[in-house]
Amino acid sequence: MAAATAVLLMAGCSDRPGIDALVPVSAPLAEGAREQVILVASTRERDPRPGVFFNGERSAQLNFAKIDLSVPPSHRPGEIEWPKNGLGNPATDMVVREAIYRDTQGEFLRDLKSELARRPAGKRNVFIFVHGYNTMFSEALYRLAQMATDSDAPAVPVLFTWASRATTEGYVYDNNSATAARDQLEETIRLAFSSGADQVSILAHSMGNWLTVEALRQIRISGKTLPANKIGNIILAAPDIDVDVFKTQLRRFGKPPKPFVVVISRDDKALGFSDFLAGKKPRLGEYANDTELVELGAVVVDMTDVKALDSFNHGKFAQLAEMAPQLQGTIARAGGTATSNTVQLQGVRITGLDQARAAQPAGPALPAATQPAPAQ
């Protein structure tokens, strides 16, 4: 127990953004910087402190926001250039340009439709990101900005952020917060589908996968299902879900019409600790039986052999952003002349391409993201 606790506490010692990470910067946009507009749906409480915006306490209602950010010209794939010493510098840091609360669902939907209209016809897609445990609002927001920039996908980025207290000892609180947010995530997903988007994709990380799969399960059993032709990629990255629970969830689903993309790494130390807390039951994000996951209806993206950007090997899928076109192309070609069920791509092993063949045509380009080292 002492060793496991030490692992968790070391995760919490990594650098994190300051309390003022979201203070808007009015300095001119740096030459070569990229702008990102992120729409937010949140079960967090609003926070009046400058630079915080949302805290880790639970809200009784779903809150909305629209946030404009800029990404510096010196940005490196997979990295977040945090603002330093108070206000950031747009030439070197990711910074918030403008942050606005939205008071109603209608305002959020209006923003979403407006952003979709700025995209080319046929590429008016939505990409929803659901973060994991031990995550500040600012961490989730900047990570989505990194993801949207690195993947270079035209999809409108939407952050669904639930009430994590962003502390290493808050695992149980965070787990309960994720569970409590199921209805609100379902609401957000349905809003995205009602926006007129061509397709909607979802990326969940770590504990956010439990929330996402539960919300999708609710949608499935409600009888008010989503239009299959608008479902893009459902990406489960480093999922902190008990494998037996996942099997039960998918039995209720039945085999999905389009396979889940499960991103795993068998050397994930954060999920190893979660195993310990769960009575040494394996987590989906480190599961060793690819064949069983494929039979359940998944394409498995195994990053075990990829060198991680974080010391806990929990955020490896950050590297997928830069190689998103190649990865999507590999999956898409499975519907054409590809004959192998398993391929290797830059150290990433992809299994279950037979699932992708059955589900053609492919959805929008697969984006990727990661959490900072302390997030699980």
Explain the meaning of each model-derived region:
Residues 1-2:
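Bacterial N-terminal signal peptides that target proteins for export
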Residues 9-12:
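C-terminal motif of bacterial Sec signal peptides marking the signal peptidase cleavage site
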Residues 14, 19-100, 110-116, 120, ...:
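Lipolytic serine-hydrolase domain surface
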Residues 104, 108:
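Walker A/P-loop-proximal flanking segment of P-loop NTPase domains
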Residues 125:
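Alpha/beta-hydrolase fold active-site loops
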Residues 128-132, 205:
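The conserved beta1-alpha1 loop
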Residues 135-140:
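Short substrate-entry loop that stabilizes the transition state in hydrolases
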Residues 185, 204-208, 212:
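Gly/Ala-rich beta-loop-alpha elbow adjacent to hydrolase catalytic centers
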